[in-house]
Amino acid sequence: MEELTIWEQHTATLYKDPRRGFGIAVSGGHDRASGSVVVSDVVPGSPAEGRLRTGDHIVMVNGVSVENVTSAFAIQILKTCTKTANVTVKRPRRVQLPATKASPASGHQLSDQEEADHGRGYEGDSSSGSGRSWGERSRRSRAGRRGRVGSHGRRSSGGGSEANGLDLVSGYKRLPKQDVLMRPLKSVLVKRRNSEEFGVKLGSQIFIKHITESGLAARNHGLQEGDLILQINGVSSANLSLSDTRRLIEKSEGELTLLVLRDSGQFLVNIPPAVSDSDSSLMEDISDLTSELSQAPPSHVPPPPLKGQRSPEDSQTDSPVETPQPRRRERSVNSRAIAEPESPGESRYDIYRVPSRQSLEDRGYSPDTRVVSFPKGASIGLRLAGGNDVGIFVSGVQAGSPADGQGIQEGDEILQVNGMPFRNLTREEAVQFLLGLPPGEDMELVTQSKTGHSLRRWSQSRVGDSFYIRTHFELEPSPPYGLGFTRGDVFHVVDTLYPGSGPGHGHSSHGGLWLAARMGRDLREQERGVIPNQSRAEQLASLEAAQRAAGVGPGASVGSNPRAEFWRLRSLRRGTKKASTQRSREDLSALTRQGHYPPYERVVLREASFKRPVVILGPVADIAMKKLTTEMPEEFEIAESMSRTDSPSKIIKLDTVRVIAERDKHALLDVTPSAIERLNYVQYYPIVIFCAPESRPALKALREWLAPASRRSSRRLYAQAQKLQKHSGHLFTATIPLHGTSDSWYQEVKAVIQQQQARPIWTAEDQLNSSSEDLDLTGHGLAASSGDLSCDSRTNSDYEDTDGEGAYTDREGGPQDVDEEVAPTALARSSEPVWVDDHQGLMGHGTTITDKWETQADSHYTQDQRRQDSMRTYKHEALRKKFTRARDVESSDDEGYDWGPATDL
């Protein structure tokens, strides 16, 4: 017997325990000897006990792949999971395979008993009672011809009319013994009560249906029709859908490795066909991987259902091939069936085929989904809960509403509405979509019931929305719960319809609120509060740009204090400096407009697959860059600059950074703060290290010790460093203090670069599908000069040989008081994580939180609008009282589930 290790794929949903967490320990990673991230321990009594095992290989966490990553990256991904984690693992299983023998001569096949022994041999047991070994069984006589067309039964070598069916095990599936003609059987399961379950767990196995004569498989002679595919490029094929298999094969990039199990009886390719072999539309085919899957019109026409009653799947049956009938209009969500042509003495059998591409099953929906239709009235009569992390659920139904009449119940998951998938929508997006439907329009909902322990467990977890955003504008905090932020801050949004705001609430015209937690530099959640939603953020960002253009908002080019006015008037006398200073002052805001970046950008945590560029800021930047390239030329390379055609300043081409990264080196850049912003926008994500001087005398002593021949002014370098820390602190990855005359700061620089390269970074969500090796980011929507990085080194280092007066930074306005207290930026703030598991304490403040934002964005709120808000609040309250079957969030456990945040429609 030969042993074979196959990989079974399992997905477990873990709910974090407040004391034990998820209850697993992980180790390994591609930086370790094991290579894969492995579950090294499972804590007894934890959520992972009974679901995960020691030795499981973690493949995916909440949709993020953790294959070929470091263990630190996998741990960070698990840490970002707030309350729930969907963990997909690979679990090895050893199976016994019989020793291979020469295949029988063409036109012959194994006897029925031999085929049964073959199936049992794969299982690796001796329960069949046959004491013979595989070698003895292989020497048994073979007789009979196998008919590919016509007769579909197998007869024994003795010519009897009965034979044992094929008992085949392929990972998850065992095909039961069939009768002589392998007739399909029809079984109807009818629910008597809603609490009943069908009690069937289905599995699937991919097999080779057909081999084209012109393909590589036909020329290789290593594959045959009917072979069971166990692995595709090392990934177990058990329970994979055809669409998932297609995507897996398309990612093979020219080399496809298949682990197959030979089915000598070719049972799967000999299933009695109900239609002609030429009707390929009835079985979805993935052989043509160069084109999209399509569903061709069938050659025969499906008649009305055999029975008058409508099943939950609304299944239909096709008429016999010989008598085509006019085609009935079908719903795309139906699961159709085909029937065996009737013959004398035989009854009719339904063979449920592989669902079409348009069916719900192929899109990941289970067969117990329901389709309900009703016209939209003044109100929909539903209360929605959940979000993009768990799905959209019905947490309440208004008695007497059309939804109630169609049988929608509390706990139903809404999968689709009028062709719009709801599985990845936030609660705010789902509510806005439903409210956007005009009254009187027919609504077709695809729902799925969630009952039992899984429903209670989900409702108690209080999870819903979960995604991460990066901000691209500035906002002042609005106490007590309104969070402020600057450009580059990252937030974890957990509720897109914070109680008391948004669609369906009385304050909707004031703008909605998102409940979010600020992410710290350690990738942990810090303080939690509310921020404006997407539409409100767009208004505030536009207001910020308008105020900056008018010179009255934050970051405006014209100062309001006397000292700023003095520097402004002084810059007017320096005509050559004014244009450059003013242009660079507006560069950051203009960059956002040029790149078409929204106020909020969806981001995900991902490991960098290339050597990130390094920007060193501060009074010793030139010394650090020179030492790095001298000591480690194989790791670092200074990006060369070139002169502008219309300006004496210099630039660095983005292509230069890309070329250095392709050499597996860190590009050392001497660029301006706005160029750092641009690098982040085009997803190069530089490592920005700021060397902070302790004082001007200490800086002078350090420069004299490190570079005694330098003539650069310590006063000027210190002033530049103060200004950088004040205005560009949000760009710093790390800040290293300069103490004394030792080189400890240089050792810290090298350590920071090494640590940051290994850490995951926040990358744009919409770029996940691009190649990780493609660093050429041309065509990302930037302006014509987006490929250039300004490297006027007076802005961030001490390359200036003169000590003349001038603008301190190329990207800031006129000089300001550098002695002012430097306020720490949002990303630089260090505070202990504050967890607010039950954010009901924030309820009731939805109006007061937005007062300051409303004053900033709209000072013309009329009395008529306030009256409309009052009427809307009254209607909302009246609608809530009509809910007889919905549970309020304050209800007790005896009354029903605590659904957490929910929205009435």
UniProtKB/Swiss-Prot annotation:
Residues 464-541 form the SH3 domain. It is a peripheral membrane protein. One of its GO terms (cellular component) is bicellular tight junction. Is concentrated in various types of epithelium, in tissues such as the lung, liver and kidney, but not in endothelium or at cadherin-based cell-cell adhesion sites. Its main location: membrane. GO terms for biological process: regulation of G1/S transition of mitotic cell cycle. Phosphorylated. Residues 11-93, 187-264, 368-434 form the PDZ domain. InterPro entries: GK/Ca_channel_bsu, Guanylate_kin-like_dom, P-loop_NTPase, PDZ, PDZ_sf, SH3-like_dom_sf, SH3_domain, ZO. It is found in: Cell membrane; Cell junction, Tight junction; Nucleus. The modification Phosphoserine is found at residues 111, 128, 156-157, 161, 195, 311, 319, 343, 359, 584, 891-892. Residues 139-155 have a biased composition (Basic residues). Residues 92-167, 289-367, 773-818, 850-905 are annotated as: Disordered. The modification Phosphothreonine is found at residue 317. Residues 851-877 have a biased composition (Basic and acidic residues). It holds the Pfam family PDZ. Keywords: Cell junction, Cell membrane, Membrane, Nucleus, Phosphoprotein, Repeat, SH3 domain, Tight junction. The keyword Cell membrane applies. Residues 124-133 have a biased composition (Low complexity). Tjp1, Tjp2, and Tjp3 are closely related scaffolding proteins that link tight junction (TJ) transmembrane proteins such as claudins, junctional adhesion molecules, and occludin to the actin cytoskeleton. The tight junction acts to limit movement of substances through the paracellular space and as a boundary between the compositionally distinct apical and basolateral plasma membrane domains of epithelial and endothelial cells. Binds and recruits PatJ to tight junctions where it connects and stabilizes apical and lateral components of tight junctions. Belongs to the MAGUK family. Interacts with occludin OCLN, claudins and TPJ1. Interacts with PATJ. Interacts with UBN1. Interacts with FASLG. Interacts with CCND1. This is Tight junction protein ZO-3. It comes from Mus musculus.
